Each structure stands twice: as structure tokens, then as C-alpha cells.
Amino acid sequence: HWTVFLNKNKEIFDEVVICTGPWSKDFLHKLGYKIPLAWERGYHHHFSIKKDIDLSPAIHDVDGGFVYSCNKNEIRVTSGVELNFRKADLNEEQINEVVQKLKIILPLKNKLTKTPWLGSRPTIADSLPMIGKAPKHKNLWFNFGHNHIGLSTSAGSGVVLADMMENKKTSINIDPFLPDRFML
């Protein structure tokens, strides 16, 4: 059995899934695992724009290295990602460069964010999520490491993991995703 502490309550479970995104490495380190996980950190800023500008809902400027999306009289601009530690200081160099490029083509008004928003996405060394049984602990399962596409891929891997937990045939070949592909 596993005892999980949630706020001031504790719950006991037969099985537990570690699906804690960028915090998975920290959780599993306490259990003796050395997960080859890094963090893709991406930044974005919000700006107001003039009301009379008609823009596409989203543009990906490959050469400029940014994406912007519009919502009413606001625009959000995102930069590429950096590989860094989850708790590393903000590195605004990339997003600031992107903002300068965007100012050349769009009349940005007020910056609506004081500092850029920062998201840390868990990235396994081989770029594949880790899905399956924990190699050292009974009834412990992994489902994390979905890189910057976790919002769209983690639910599908959850279905696959549920099948694994129930000893059902999975809809995909799970071998490339198994945790034991690494010496943890």
C-alpha cells in the first residue's frame, strides 16, 4: 500500500501513479530514482494592441523564432525554449529579443505582464515520456516527461497506462516508453 499526504489529510492507495510533470524528478529522487529529466522552459509576454488592427488569430514566424496569438485587444508572444533547471533564474534574453522583432511589425502598446510568464516542461533525455511500472517499487507507476506537448499527449498516455495497470493489451507498442529503458 501507498500512503499519500494531501494537505493535512492522508489517503491510502493500493497503487500510485507519479504524473507530477516538472516535479516528477523531485518526487522520485526521494525514492532513490535518478531520472534523466531536464526542463524545457518557455516564456511569454502579453501586450495590448490598437483596437482597429485586424490580425490573424495566431502566427508562427519561423525565421523570427516566435509565435503570437491574439485575443480581442491583446496579443501574447512566445519565445522558443531553453533547457535549464526548473528553479533557475529567469533568462529574459530570448523573449526580449522576440519582443523587439515583433515591435518592428506590430504597434504593441502597453506590456500587460511585468515579468514574462515561465513554464517548465519535463523532458526526458530521449524525448519520449516515461510510461509504465516503476522498476524498484511494487504498485508504483510513472506517467510523465511529455515535453512541451504534455497538455495534448498526457491524456492519451493515461489511457495506455490504465490498460497496463489492468493487464490489458495497449493500443500502442509501449516498449519505447517503459521506465526500464534507463538504469534508474
PLM region descriptions:
Residues 134-184:
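C-terminal lid/capping helical subdomain adjacent to the catalytic/cofactor pocket in oxidative enzymes
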Residues 10-138:
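Active-site substrate-recognition segment that forms the wall
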Residues 6, 85, 148:
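Short, flexible active-site loop motifs that bind/organize anionic cofactors or intermediates
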Residues 1-11:
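Conserved beta-strand-loop-beta-strand element in the redox core of flavoprotein oxidoreductases
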Residues 6, 36-37, 170, 175:
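Short linear sequence motifs
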Residues 3-5, 77, 143:
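Generic recognition of long tandem-repeat/solenoid scaffolds
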